[in-house]
Amino acid sequence: MKKGMKVSLSVAAAALLMSAPAAFAFHSGGVAECEGCHTMHNSLGGAVMNSATAQFTTGPMLLQGATQSSSCLNCHQHAGDTGPSSYHISTAEADMPAGTAPLQMTPGGDFGWVKKTYTWNVRGLNTSEGERKGHNIVAGDYNYVADTTLTTAPGGTYPANQLHCSSCHDPHGKYRRFVDGSIATTGLPIKNSGSYQNSNDPTAWGAVGAYRILGGTGYQPKSLSGSYAFANQVPAAVAPSTYNRTEATTQTRVAYGQGMSEWCANCHTDIHNSAYPTNLRHPAGNGAKFGATIAGLYNSYKKSGDLTGTQASAYLSLAPFEEGTADYTVLKGHAKIDDTALTGADATSNVNCLSCHRAHASGFDSMTRFNLAYEFTTIADASGNSIYGTDPNTSSLQGRSVNEMTAAYYGRTADKFAPYQRALCNKCHAKD
């Protein structure tokens, strides 16, 4: 090959790489490359798979892992990460020793938190168990095991020992969104992902993948026996294409449109309620509209003691809301990481499960976005400056290092909050 041709091909290849949306290159359009997950002949590079490293031993369904989740983590966890990294959703154990937080800061959270158990001694020994901090996926190759306490999904019957990434995400990405907004598993070909603010829209000849390749109506993993098919469709939502990042300076806004709580209810059916009034379950879902009063509180609340906020800059990713729309033009305009779209709630906005919880795991019990196990988010030093604390063996840090607490708040240092900041339930309720 002539030198000039080599240079031209190199430039062309580089241009293609730069133009390709890296966030969904492997799962482009939903489905991944078959050989990325499966091995046809128990071989890899001419060698028997089971003689390779343990996590790449062939598993059921010709997977390149012992379980579905292990196969996912072959790509979605990477030993040696030093910070939030692209599409990684789990931190290797060696990269999060005692006193060090899991590294990934995707909107869904880092599964590594479920391996973090904390103890502290205040009026006796207190414990925050790791398994209480998230969905306990089964991925033995990576030392993730089923929840030992909650043997079925809270509010439902989905078996904990069968909880895999594929319990929520359709690994073959069959669910697709058409130009009229409808969702189906067949029809037009899927031309690209539909998850991101820079995703191409569906057209008359091509659909786009459902949000985060989630399973929709009728979905049930083939490996799961019994009757667990989803009753509700995938939600309308859009994420920024760069989403795994610290929020120390600017926030990562996922634009939640509608249907998230309804989708969560596929497994957690009996703990959902979308209609007022109730004194048993916090309303969540398309019917749980803020109304003018709650929207006004959300928009005015900045921190404990400060209700001077305005709607134009009220959004907080530690307490996101659903916008009550499936208009993807609107949602794409709000999925940002540069704080140029911080518009707050209105009367038609609503609470959804992810207003309080993260989808994968978090640094706190019940996988909440903020700590509910102590009345204060911060305390104060002698000068009145906000701090998370200095001693892990206190109620403020609850066994965590300052580094871990900061990471649990996605890089936010304590001075982002008021001294003696109360729980962020007050973003909507303003009781402080």
Swiss-Prot record:
Domain of life: Bacteria
Keyword flag Phosphoprotein: no
Cofactor or coenzyme needed: heme
Annotated localization: Cell outer membrane; Cell surface
Reported induction: Expressed in the presence of insoluble Fe(3+) oxide and during growth with fumarate as the sole electron acceptor, but not during growth on soluble Fe(3+) citrate. Induced in the cocultures with G.metallireducens.
Biological process, per Gene Ontology: anaerobic respiration
Observed effect of gene inactivation: Deletion of the gene inhibits Fe(3+) oxide reduction, but does not impact reduction of fumarate or Fe(3+) citrate. Deletion negatively impacts the expression of omcT.
CDD domains documented for this protein: OmcS-like (cd21555)
Signal sequence coordinates: 1-25
Chief location of this protein within or outside the cell: membrane
Record keywords: Cell outer membrane, Electron transport, Heme, Iron, Membrane, Metal-binding, Signal, Transport
Keyword Transport applies: yes
Gene3D superfamilies referenced in this protein's UniProt entry, alphabetically: Flavocytochrome C3, Chain A
Cofactor note: Binds 6 low-spin heme groups per subunit.
GO molecular function annotation: electron transfer activity; metal ion binding
GO cellular component, one term: cell surface
Role of this protein: Plays an important role in extracellular electron transfer. Can transfer electrons to insoluble Fe(3+) oxides as well as other extracellular electron acceptors, including Mn(4+) oxide and humic substances. Essential for direct interspecies electron transfer (DIET) in cocultures with G.metallireducens.
Protein name: C-type cytochrome OmcS
Organism: Geobacter sulfurreducens (strain ATCC 51573 / DSM 12127 / PCA)
